[in-house]
Structures are given as C-alpha cells and as structure tokens.
C-alpha cells in the first residue's frame, strides 16, 4: 500500500514564531478596554492580488454530503453517476484523519485517490471535509491531548493551543491538499478546526486546557497589553505578573478578558490555517459555520470572523442550519456586504417536521443572492433523510439553479450587537436574536438588511447609508452615533415597513413564506413559495407589491413558473396583484412576476384578500393525537433528546391522559417547559389579547407561568398559576395582553408553560386559547 511521507523535521511553531503570530494579530484586540474587537479596517483588507484571485472562478456547490466511503468500499463511478444525474456537481466527504494519516508523518491516500478518480469519471468533484475532531476517525488516534471546559470537564477536541498537535492538524490538511489539488476529481476543501463546525463546543465551552491557559499567559496577554501596568489600568486590578491573571470562566470577574482570548484564538488559527492551505492550492476553499447566533459566546462561532477571513482568502462560507430564516437572512446580508460566496446546508429535524423544514431550507437560498454559492444536503446516508428530505432537495435543484438576480435588500437595517460574544458584559443578549429576526421577516415579508456590530466596527458597513435602523438587542455606541448624526432609530418591528415596504402580504405568515429574487434590470422577479408548517396548511391569498420587490414602477402580473400560465389574480392599485392560494403542508412553488397586465382570458377571482379570519378559539388535549385539528399542537411530544427544555411524555394520572414535562434530572438542563404552537391562520394567532385556559394536575409547590411571544419580548411573563393540595385536576384561566404570536420562541413556538419546579414533573391535560372578544 503506497504511502507519502512528510518532509523530515516537524514544523512545530516555536516560542518566538508563535509570539510573532500573536503580535501580528494583536491589533485585533483593544487593550484599552479589555474588550477584543473584530478586525480593523487594515486587517479586513482583502490581501494580495494572488490571494484574492484564488478560487474565484469556483463553480457553485450543488452537493450532498457522504461518509468517507461506502462501509469500507470506495464510492464507485456508478454511485457518483447517480448523484450527477440528480443535478449535483459535487459531493462532500467526511475525512477520517486517522485513516489518511495512520501514524504521524505517514499518509495513505490509496482510497481517497480511487474515489477522486471515480468521481472525475462521473463528472463529479469531491470536496473533502477536514474535521479536526468530532467525526469518526478525527482526530487521529495518535493525537492524545484533550480539551477542558470552563467547569473542568473533559472535552472532545485536542487542546486548541497545544502547538505541536495544532501543527499536526495543519500538516495533515496541507499535505493532503497538496497531494490532490491538481486531481480532476478535486473540488476544494472544507476547513474545520475545533469540534466539528462549532469551534469551542467541547461538551460545553472549551478553552481551559493547560496549553490554552499557558498560551493566554505567556503570549496573548503580553502581546495584547504589553505591560501588566496597562492591563491593571484597563481592568482595575493590581497584578504584578501576567501569570496572576485568571483564566476566568463565564460569570467570574475578568471573564471578558478570557473570552476575548478565546474569540481571538478562532480568528488567528483559522487565518493561519487558511494561509497555509493557500500556499499549496489555489482551488476552492470553504468554512463551515455550525450552530446559531446565540452560540457565539460559548462556541466562538462569530459570523464576521469567518466572513473577514473568507474575503481575504477567497473562501466560500457554508452556513449550517440554513433552514432558519433568521440565520439565512443574517448570512445573506453578510455575504453581500463582504462580497463573499455563501452556500447553505440544513440540519434535519425529526421525521414529522422534516418535509416542511426541507422546503423552508430550500426556499431560503434566495436570501443569499447574488452571492449564492450553492447548496449541500446533509447527509446522503441511507437514513430517513434520504427517504424524506433528499427527493425534495433533488427535485428543487433545477429551480434553485435557475434563480437569477438578487434578494431585494432595502436600505433599512436590523442591527445586532455581538459585543457580548467578545466579552463585553454589557452587550446585548444574543439568546433570542435569530428567532426574532425570523419573526420580523415572517411577519412583514420585508427585504430589510441584517447588520452586525462587528461589520460596523471593522468598517465593512456604514450605518449612515441606511434610512432607518432597528436595534434588535439594545442600542450600543454605533446606534447612538448613527442617531446623533441624524439617523432614524426605530423602536418596534411594526415600523419596518414604513421604510422597507413588504414585497408580499400573506394571510398567515407562519404557514407560508415567500423568498424573492429580483432580476438585475428590476423589471421582473422570481418568487419561491414554501408552505413551511408541518401541521397547519395555508389557505388564503398572496398580495404582491412591486415596490417591495424593488421593481421599476408599472403594472405586473403573476405567472406559474411550472406551466408558464398566468395565475388567477386580481390587479392591485400599486401595480401588483392578489393571487388566491390554498396549499398543503410542506409544498414548494415558483412564481414569476412579469411586466404588463395579465393576458386576456386570465381568470379574475370574485374576491381576493389576506384579511383576517380563522378560528376565534383553538385548543389541544392530551390523547387527541396532537395533530393540530383544533388549532394548537404541543411541541416535542415523545422527544427523547437530552439537553432539551421542552420534552413531553404521554402518560396517565388521575384517570386522565396527560402530557408530562421532563424533570431537570431527565433532560440535564434546569428549566422545564411545555411549548405550544398555534394555527397561524387562526384569529387567535393574530390577536393582541388572548384568554388562556389550562387544565393541569394541581399539587402544592408546582405550577407554571405562561410565557408568550409579545411585541416586546418573545418570552413575556404572563400570570403564574400556583398548584395546591396533594393532587387533583384543576382548571385555570389567565389573560395574555400585548401578544404578538410570531413563533419566536424555541422550536418555532408561540408560547410556553414554564414549570415552577423543574425538578418535578408538571402534568397537563388540555389548553384552550380564545380571542378576548369571546
């Protein structure tokens, strides 16, 4: 079996070289405030002409992910041909470091070379995923170090700042890429340092291994602050050496300093890794972004870090979990601001939710245009994802590949403060930011732009170019400066459409979503319509507004892209049209909005409106099948995943079928909740004041608080119900005011019953919600 060896002598980063690397990046940290900042204008530059040109001509990634091989056998030409026949041009394969490099410095490329040859013969390119850890076979067995969490627990990855093992990974990647970069079956490489695609996510928050703390003391602190006196001045301390500065865990004094170091570590390491790969290959490169916006403080997955490096080294960013509109919108805005290609991938849910989530993920692709870099299906592995999700994805590929133009971004910003992730304790919370972006967009179907504090700080974006700014998680210094310079700062999402008009009106926003692509000449548009609710169908109309689509003024009509025929429609005064639409769950459609009135003979419905309607009372009860037939579903019934705060089990107590919440001992998390979703087409879902009636098993010491999506808080505290006695079925009715049910809570919920004592179960028999007029 042939082997390829590294050149003699391991290139471990010595002390001085490592210190120089920190010095080179020290301007990324602000020693004056103990709050690391993202890249400055200088460090955000696109680098040399050679670097900027690398990979620029790479085609879009239309791909599915595969295991490294087919149960020990190389993927065959026939298997790759079957993938190509579905409209894909690439496959991502999960690389097992230990198989490729079974011992330090000794490589076995036999199977990889065979697969590359087979792929090339089928017209497919292979994109290796270079996991450092977290996937089978990575890290290699001869890598022995282990990361440590902030609580002292064992992590998954090697210690981030074990320089010898870090260099081992760098050498594994660069040696492999150098070997395959000119192979016709090679389609680029995905770089992933840390745990999978979520950096510091090591059974919690990694970064407290001895090697990490040593690097913090010996390199980062001296290069950032230069002297202990400057550190003391910035942080109000009285240390006599850097070794005395604690590697503070979250919640402890000086935690922000260590958080700065962790975030800088991601930026520095990915930068050096990418530069090393660019020295051996000009082929396509990719970064995976795993997790969600709320994970940035713990995981270190700051979006702007990856986009800054992607701009410098011509890397495509792949956003995982792109089924989230809030995440896809944010990354689409960033991709367009940084001029970086954006590919999208989903994280598949449980089978019942999979069809609706698949069409949601697919329809979100247009949010990244004109910077769209393709799609990847996770994962073609013979499981239910292949049976349910894969056919939906492959059937939609021709539609996605035919989208031409741009998402119609308006000069209105939804602003997200990310400074908390850099260690600023006063920064805005990111916990609900992504869901709130989703709720804003779903409610108003408006082409606002998402802007991050990092974009403004590194001068990629200037807030002055926006007609209005809506701060999502607090007004920081950037927003204050914008307002002082005459900018308009909004205080509520309902004000968005005054500055960024809706491109469509919907009957029920959280059952249907519409993602537009406007042609470059602004005289036509493509609309991808997705029925995204796994339970509740859409029944109503869609009103199209040319101004929101950024079309030139005039008359337009809607055409079914599949048939080329004009849809039944009623002309609107603004030049758009109202199109009746009734569609089942988890369906996709494409419309074209074209200039001119509808052709003669096009049916004109007698009426067409998105006006409110629907049920004024909705309910659900344990034992009714939880199918939403009465307008409410309990979320996560039968779920068994650890770490979830909303799992429910079907049980029986007091002679009644009931839902039982998991205790904190079962779930491993301290809160316990019962999450509820309302039929978005009901009058209840649109009501501002709602009466909630709950039948529950009453015992002393147990109860619940109704927390609901409101105009100001997705988890607004409503009334608390307190149990009594030793156990009996009781019914309580409370009133929820200022409601705005936008599915902004976890798992797209509208409200939850927060358990008073999560160490004990709460039993629920039924819920009913009625408009206040009832």
In which residue ranges do the predicted regions lie?
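Extracellular carbohydrate recognition and processing domains
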Residues: 713-745
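Polysaccharide-binding and catalytic clefts of secreted carbohydrate-active enzymes
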Residues: 152-322
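Short beta-strand-plus-loop segments that form exposed binding edges in beta-rich domains
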Residues: 751-760
